[in-house]
Regions:
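Divalent metal-coordination and catalytic microenvironments
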Residues: 83, 182, 212, 267, ...
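Active-site-proximal, well-structured secondary-structure segments within enzyme catalytic domains
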Residues: 1-158, 217-266, 270, 281-284, ...
Length: 358
């Protein structure tokens, strides 16, 4: 992005359309609240409950409708198959590998000549002592300096464990999370550099979310869902009418989602442009959001005291990079939409800036 001016230009260009759309969504929810005989004003903590009611009434669709078709096993298979088709690699389960918990699974990643590419680990399930959220970590970065080192990376999530009666069934948002973190994992696994300091996700922040957000497109694709979204009991493919409902509401709640994200991006920049040593956090946030004319019904995705990304998570003054990468991802994925979902030559559009092997 080069400078703050360019970042603000991107955020400002999106802010007004996003908040305009968010206001329409607010009005829809407020109308529903009143229609149900209530007279209170919508608050941020009411949003998800009532927005789901609006979605159900407008599209006859709920994310819970998808869950029986999104078993963890099948969604992971979808991710692996997508990578295999795009990058000519394969994932082989390993029975023995040092690990810090018994739930971790290890996979040897091989190229089409059966040569080792790296090791991919998964730690998918929630447990009492585990940090919340989802992320990718590299235990060994790929490099060629002083001998070849193959990458060892892990995807960590907090999905519910299977029960005696049911496998782990994901919400669609959780399926997207799996693909997102898998994109980060591929960024580390397919790195092709000499020096470890440039390996994997060690790219400019403008690009670091590019491979992860790019991967999300495949799980959103009806073609992939038709192949891998299978009912956990019957094995039947996801019904066409359910897919159509899903496609119709793809942009539902986008005003809200974009507004809360942008508010957090502005907050990040405000903190890292501030020179004062002592500050009242609440007043600082209130002043910023008032200047932006942020709708009171929508909170920032993260408040200052819970904004791990920008204070200890490596995104200091660069939380904007999610949107920056989204712009890149949108342009790059257009090529796949035109030439085919698994068109290998289209990979040139994502390989160069992210230093991936081709």
């Amino acid at each position: 992005a080069e400078n703050k001016k360019n970042v603000l230009e991107l955020l400002d260009n999106v802010w007004e359309p996003a908040t305009n759309r968010a206001q329409e969504e607010i009005d829809e929810i407020q109308n529903l609240i009143q229609k149900e005989g209530n007279n209170f004003k919508l608050k941020p903590w009411d949003w998800w409950y009532y927005s789901e009611k609006v979605r159900k009434s407008k599209f006859d669709y709920s994310e819970e409708d998808m869950r029986p078709y999104l078993s963890l096993e099948n969604i992971q298979k979808a991710a692996f198959t997508t990578a295999e088709r795009l990058f000519d690699i394969k994932f082989k389960a390993m029975k023995k590998f040092p690990k810090y918990h018994e739930e971790i699974k290890a996979y040897k990643v091989l190229d089409n000549n059966n040569k080792i590419v790296g090791i991919f680990l998964t730690d998918y399930f929630a447990r009492p002592s585990k940090q919340g959220g989802a992320w990718m970590t590299s235990y060994q970065d790929q490099s060629k300096n002083k001998g070849i080192k193959h990458p060892i990376v892990i995807n960590v999530c907090n999905f519910p464990k299977p029960t005696k009666d049911k496998p782990t069934l994901l919400s669609f948002e959780q399926a997207i999370t799996l693909f997102h973190e898998f994109g980060h994992g591929l960024h580390g696994l397919l790195s092709n550099v000499t020096y470890p300091s440039l390996s994997g996700t060690s790219v400019p922040r403008d690009y670091v979310e590019f491979p992860s957000q790019m991967m999300e497109n495949w799980i959103r694709s009806p073609k992939v869902l038709k192949e891998f979204a299978l009912h956990y009991e019957t094995g039947k493919k996801i019904p066409q009418d359910l897919l159509k409902k899903y496609e119709k509401c793809q942009k539902f709640n986008q005003g809200f989602a974009t507004t809360e994200y942008l508010a957090a991006s502005y907050l990040d920049l405000a903190w890292h442009s501030n020179n004062r040593k002592i500050i009242d956090i609440n007043k600082f946030e209130q002043k910023l959001f008032k200047s932006l004319k942020k709708p009171n019904e929508i909170d920032s995705r993260y408040g200052s005291t819970y904004f791990n990304h920008i204070f200890s998570g490596g995104y200091s003054s660069s939380y904007y990079s999610y949107m920056w990468s989204e712009v890149l991802d949108s342009s790059a994925f257009e090529v796949f939409e035109k030439k085919g979902l698994f068109h290998k030559l289209s990979l040139i559009h994502i390989s160069e800036p992210t230093r991936l092997r081709r």
